């Protein structure tokens, strides 16, 4: 019932109503949040780094079953540029390594 009464109001009006109904101590607690704990701030760079590494290796996880499946011939599993050692690589333009 309360939801039906409040649903025509905009989110800004609902926020103003909520702040009006709360006691002043709760409002100041909502507006002035304490800073995060120092241990969490130290852990944040490691979380960001692990997320970036996961995104970097994500394509490898999807192609790993295809690369390891024995039903495909080796020419399909490994492109030609992977099958040659760097000093025996066939001559090709440098832009070919970008694709």
Curated annotation (Swiss-Prot):
Chain positions of cross-link Glycyl lysine isopeptide (Lys-Gly) (interchain with G-Cter in ubiquitin): 88
GO terms of biological process kind: symbiont-mediated suppression of host antigen processing and presentation of peptide antigen via MHC class I
Function of the protein: p12I is a modulator of T-lymphocyte proliferation and immune function and may contribute to establish a persistent infection. Binds and down-modulates cell surface expression of interleukin-2 receptors IL2RB and IL2RG. Also down-modulates cell surface MHC-I molecules by binding to free immature MHC-I heavy chains in the ER and targeting them to the proteasome for degradation. Binding to IL2RB mediates recruitment of JAK1 and JAK3. As a result of this interaction, p12I increases DNA-binding and transcriptional activity of STAT5.
Cell wall biogenesis/degradation keyword on record: no
Keyword Transit peptide: no
GO cellular component, one term: membrane
Cross-referenced InterPro entries: p12I
Keyword terms: Evasion of host immunity by viral interleukin-like protein, Host endoplasmic reticulum, Host Golgi apparatus, Host membrane, Host-virus interaction, Inhibition of host adaptive immune response by virus, Inhibition of host MHC class I molecule presentation by virus, Isopeptide bond, Membrane, SH3-binding, Transmembrane, Transmembrane helix, Ubl conjugation, Viral immunoevasion
Post-translational modification summary for this protein: Ubiquitinated; a fraction of P12I is degraded via the ubiquitin system.
GO molecular function: SH3 domain binding
Summary of subunit composition and partner proteins: p12I is a homodimer. Interacts with human CANX, CALR, ATP6V0C, IL2RB, IL2RG. Binds to MHC-I heavy chains HLA-A2, HLA-B7 and HLA-Cw4.
Remaining remarks: Lys-88 seems to be associated with tropical spastic paraparesis/HTLV-1-associated myelopathy (TSP/HAM).
TM spans (from-to): 3-23, 48-68
Family that this chain belongs to: Belongs to the HTLV-1 accessory protein p12I family.
Protein name per the record: Accessory protein p12I
Highest taxon in the source lineage: Viruses
Motif window: SH3-binding: 4-11, 33-38, 70-77, 88-93
